[in-house]
């Protein structure tokens, strides 16, 4: 029987890792999740991993409880399922975006930025029956600055993985993890709001949630989605606990993503006066 490397992934963050492995391995198969039904038409929407497989003629299947018989080993990155112990007959390695044992769980990048860490990184480890506790085979530190967005961090990791992939020996050395209780949570929409934050906290949320979110400023029943901010002053700051936040790119209600100042300039004068009173714009 021909043996294959298997990749497990199910969202947009999985794709750069899959692309690197695809460009380096001849015998590759992919396991992903089934399409979700969404929209008014209740149409099935494939995830980005399935789309990449179709575009590049990569064989793929949907996850079920039976491990593939032709698997040599697997690599998982941002996969929506937790593997039961019965599935781990062959070794499966996970790419986790923190320096384990710190920041186990689903949101290590976002949590590190929110906690204003100066360093994080990524870990490749052998999956065991617990969550993010397996033996480590590779780690790489990555600096985080006060200007680092989550998207920047993901890009740093993807570039490093691409550069070092051919030199990573998954079976060369296994390092047991220290026992540290350091877990992250799955964020919900309420976590994205910045209304009650001070300036530092708001900036951290905008940087942390620009992939999973984005951050949100709530105005009555309307949500202004915030993709980025600038430290350069302009005429349309938002006031947070007496401090001025200068937005850069936003998605206003019912509109496409756009430059924030262009959006403000496009408001009619009368609406502008009402809007600034409601959400504390300082025009």
Task: Give the residues covered by each predicted segment.
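A generic structural signal for well-ordered alpha-helical segments
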Residues: 52-53, 117, 210
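Glycine/alanine-rich phosphate-binding loops at beta-alpha junctions
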Residues: 2-23, 32, 40-55
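Hydrophobic beta-strand scaffold residues
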Residues: 59-60, 92
């Amino acid at each position: 029987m021909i043996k294959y490397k298997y990749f497990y992934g199910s969202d947009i963050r999985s794709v750069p890792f899959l692309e690197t492995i695809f460009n380096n391995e001849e015998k590759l198969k992919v396991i992903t999740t089934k399409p979700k039904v969404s929209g008014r038409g209740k149409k099935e929407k494939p995830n980005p991993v399935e789309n990449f497989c179709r575009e590049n003629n990569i064989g793929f299947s949907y996850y079920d409880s039976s491990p593939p018989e032709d698997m040599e080993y697997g690599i998982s990155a941002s996969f929506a399922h937790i593997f039961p112990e019965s599935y781990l007959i062959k070794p499966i390695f996970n790419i986790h975006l923190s320096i384990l044992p710190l920041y186990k769980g689903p949101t290590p990048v976002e949590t590190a930025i929110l906690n204003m860490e100066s360093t994080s990184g990524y870990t490749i480890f052998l999956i065991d029956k617990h969550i993010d506790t397996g033996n480590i085979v590779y780690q790489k530190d990555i600096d985080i600055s006060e200007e680092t967005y989550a998207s920047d961090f993901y890009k740093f990791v993807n570039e490093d993985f691409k550069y070092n992939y051919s030199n990573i020996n998954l079976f060369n050395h296994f390092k047991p993890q220290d026992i540290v209780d350091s877990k992250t949570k799955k964020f919900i929409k309420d976590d994205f709001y910045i209304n009650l934050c001070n300036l530092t906290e708001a900036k951290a949320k905008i940087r942390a949630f620009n992939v999973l979110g984005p951050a949100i400023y709530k105005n009555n029943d309307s949500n202004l989605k915030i993709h980025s901010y600038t430290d350069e002053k302009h005429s349309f700051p938002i006031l947070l606990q007496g401090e001025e936040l200068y937005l850069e790119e936003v998605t206003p209600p019912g509109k496409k993503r756009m430059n924030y100042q262009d959006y403000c300039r496009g408001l009619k004068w009368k609406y502008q006066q009402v809007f600034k009173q409601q959400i504390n714009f300082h025009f």
